[in-house]
């Protein structure tokens, strides 16, 4: 039987997914059926990603991955899709300084393949080739978020 304690008596860190869910999904194809006709060049696709986490208890957290993709041909929207995909995670035994990286890097990394598949399916079902979103560097996203928050804190700390 596996021992849940290491040699100094501390609990080994555990991260598990208790549930995954689609909170919100929308797909707009405002130019249909004209937008489905062959075109000379591929539309420009802009993808925005956001991650949020909220505590549900001392060990359970709701982590939400938001993906927003818009395809444009010039100034005309070809399609627009939004997905808010969440997971309830049990996070236990991690040192406090590791909690934010676990919630904002590891949890969305686990959710991403499922969210990516939903976006691919909905764009395909909308009459377009499946939109296969490239892997996301959640470590870089988290580092950028921390840097932005530190910069905001510095600006607020400067007296007028």
From Swiss-Prot:
GO terms for cellular component: cytoplasm. The lineage of its organism: Bacteria, Pseudomonadati, Pseudomonadota, Alphaproteobacteria, Hyphomicrobiales. Its main location: cytoplasm. Belongs to the SecB family. Homotetramer, a dimer of dimers. One homotetramer interacts with 1 SecA dimer. The keyword Cytoplasm applies. HAMAP family: SecB (MF_00821). One of the proteins required for the normal export of preproteins out of the cell cytoplasm. It is a molecular chaperone that binds to a subset of precursor proteins, maintaining them in a translocation-competent state. It also specifically binds to its receptor SecA. It is found in: Cytoplasm. PANTHER family: PROTEIN-EXPORT PROTEIN SECB, PTHR36918. It comes from the Bacteria. It comes from Rhizobium etli (strain ATCC 51251 / DSM 11541 / JCM 21823 / NBRC 15573 / CFN 42). The keyword Flavoprotein does not apply. This is Protein-export protein SecB. GO terms for molecular function: unfolded protein binding. Keywords: Chaperone, Cytoplasm, Protein transport, Translocation, Transport. One of its GO terms (biological process) is protein tetramerization.
